[in-house]
């Protein structure tokens, strides 16, 4: 099945502590999760690695979030939207369901 949400899409979080926040998808994982810039930040306690000259400490990084908890953001309507698929000139393309506008 084709992916409805892909890398570099702007998404909006639907549920959880970051509900309503928007961000850009950095990575889509095969486990049905996505990593979004600035969303679901967690603190990781990292040990120093002297061989790589890396200091230790507490590092903030983005954790994965379920793809079902995000929706693609439609810039023309300013709201979250659903994604559909259709064929244009023999190619399968994604489109917004609310206004039938093709995505990128």
Curated annotation (Swiss-Prot):
Gene Ontology terms for molecular function: rRNA binding; structural constituent of ribosome
UniProtKB keywords: Ribonucleoprotein, Ribosomal protein, RNA-binding, rRNA-binding
CDD domains xrefs: KOW_RPL26
GO cellular component, one term: ribosome
Cited InterPro entries: KOW, Rib_uL2_dom2, Ribosomal_uL24, Ribosomal_uL24_CS, Ribosomal_uL24_KOW, Translation_prot_SH3-like_sf
Family affiliation: Belongs to the universal ribosomal protein uL24 family.
Subunit record text: Part of the 50S ribosomal subunit.
Name assigned to this protein: Large ribosomal subunit protein uL24
């Amino acid at each position: 099945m084709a992916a409805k949400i892909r890398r570099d899409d702007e998404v909006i979080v639907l549920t959880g502590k970051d509900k309503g926040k928007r961000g850009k998808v950095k990575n889509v994982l095969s486990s049905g999760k996505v990593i979004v810039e600035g969303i679901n930040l967690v603190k990781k306690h990292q040990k120093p690695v002297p061989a790589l000259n890396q200091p230790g400490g507490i590092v903030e990084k983005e954790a994965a979030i379920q793809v079902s908890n995000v929706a693609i953001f439609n810039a023309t309507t300013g709201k979250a939207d659903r994604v559909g698929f259709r064929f244009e000139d023999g190619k399968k393309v994604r489109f917004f369901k609310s206004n039938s506008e093709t995505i990128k």
